[in-house]
């Protein structure tokens, strides 16, 4: 989709059309740009940019918080349209997916007709534009979809066509080459895709297995199948929050970790996942980040996540914190899960759950909020962020 969040907002509010629109944090808040429309990009604003830098570049822009409930609803309709044409659908984001239309289209011409039909239906049914790439591989299709944005359509039929299109472009045009990898290549004098093709052994020596893949892509090779996302294949489940002002209060940070742990528990339970590792993420006030991990018996218990992240936090120096996060990793489903002490001794789980309930009671007394009665609402949309900001101001 083209500037998805911003396009949805402009569709629903005609007054926003033609104006630079930045979705993310507000200018006086901490945060980044989630997305922006093409009018804002003319000022140099882009996704992931610090919001204050965006405001410096585009002070006349319209700044809005994202409305994820609205975007998810549109995303569901998009998937319904896509599913009419694809035998396999691999969702990359709310607004982006790979579609394997081979079995339904049966010919290149029909595949191209499907692409145009998807564009037509997206415009007529959702009043949104999209850019579609038709190609022989996932990498080529992604490249094609970016070629004529916005409202674009482009075809790359063969590896030779792909190479001819990109070989004189910056190496960063390859979607497997991030900024750090690009800098490594640049220091070695490898600037373009053609350079990668001319010096494949050097790229492999420099980057190892990643270099092998990048070299293959530079030659137009990509045999990856379109694979529908399966939650059980996820490597981690996590939740994090950025504070509007740095926080050093350990009691408050542990209260936030309890809410984050409950959120992680809910996400893991939704997909039937358990984890054997807990991760704490912290970003200090100077923007330096670190993660700490601990091993736990197979669990998705908020109590276990809370206890372990609290323990990990206690190992860190007391410094102003800008962001804090909790996560569960080494994931697996019920079938591969080993029996834990909670299965053998249910009273252990009960005692830990009681610790969570007592923690919520203490938080109610401290902040004046009924957390137990409002957990469903707290974890909905942006409410968790707003709740934590209220807690920070009223502690």
Region spans (language model):
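Short, contiguous acidic/charged loop-to-helix segments that flank catalytic cores in large enzymes
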Residues: 295-300, 345-351
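Short, charged/polar, Gly/Pro-enriched secondary-structure boundary elements
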Residues: 105-109, 332-339
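Gly/Gly-Pro- and Ser/Thr-rich, intrinsically disordered tail segments characteristic of DNA damage-repair
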Residues: 1-216, 226, 266, 347-395
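DNA-contacting surface of Y-family translesion DNA polymerases
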Residues: 173, 181-323, 333-336
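Glycine-rich beta-alpha junction loops
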Residues: 136, 284, 330
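Short, hydrophobic beta-strand segments
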Residues: 97-103, 289-294, 339-345
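Non-catalytic, largely sequence-independent nucleic-acid-binding elements associated
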Residues: 329-334, 395
């Amino acid at each position: 989709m083209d500037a998805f969040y911003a396009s949805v907002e402009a569709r629903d509010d005609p007054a926003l059309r033609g104006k630079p629109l930045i979705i993310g944090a507000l200018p006086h808040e901490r945060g980044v740009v989630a997305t922006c429309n093409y009018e804002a990009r003319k000022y140099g604003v882009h996704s992931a940019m610090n919001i204050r830098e965006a405001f410096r570049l585009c002070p006349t822009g319209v700044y809005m918080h994202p409305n994820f409930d609205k975007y998810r609803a549109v995303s569901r309709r998009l998937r319904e349209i896509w599913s009419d044409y694809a035998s396999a659908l691999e969702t990359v984001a709310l607004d982006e997916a790979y579609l394997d239309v081979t079995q339904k289209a049966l010919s290149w011409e029909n595949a191209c007709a499907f692409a145009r039909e998807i564009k037509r239906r997206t415009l007529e049914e959702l009043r949104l534009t999209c850019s579609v790439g038709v190609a022989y591989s996932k990498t080529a299709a992604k490249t094609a979809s970016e070629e004529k944005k916005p409202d674009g359509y482009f075809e790359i039929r063969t590896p030779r066509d792909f190479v001819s299109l990109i070989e004189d472009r910056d190496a960063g045009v390859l979607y497997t080459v991030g900024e750090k990898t690009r800098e490594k290549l640049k220091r070695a004098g490898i600037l373009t895709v053609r350079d990668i093709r001319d010096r494949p052994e050097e790229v492999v020596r420099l980057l190892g297995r990643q270099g092998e893949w990048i070299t293959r892509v530079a030659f137009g090779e990509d045999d990856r199948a379109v694979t529908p996302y399966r939650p059980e294949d996820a490597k981690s489940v996590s939740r994090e929050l950025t504070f509007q002002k740095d926080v050093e209060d350990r009691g408050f940070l542990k209260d936030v970790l309890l809410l984050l742990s409950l959120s992680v528990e809910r996400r893991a339970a939704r997909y039937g996942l358990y984890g054997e590792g807990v991760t704490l993420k912290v970003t200090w006030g100077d923007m330096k980040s670190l993660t700490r991990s601990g091993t736990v018996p197979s669990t998705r218990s908020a109590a276990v996540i809370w206890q372990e992240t609290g323990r990990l936090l206690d190992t860190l120096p007391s410094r102003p914190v800008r962001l804090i996060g909790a996560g569960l990793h080494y994931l697996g489903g019920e079938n591969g899960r080993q029996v834990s002490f909670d299965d053998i001794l249910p009273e252990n789980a009960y005692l830990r759950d009681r610790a969570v309930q007592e923690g919520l009671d203490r938080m109610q007394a401290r902040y004046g909020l009924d957390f137990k009665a409002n957990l469903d609402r707290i974890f909905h949309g942006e409410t968790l962020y707003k709740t934590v900001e209220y807690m920070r101001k009223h502690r």
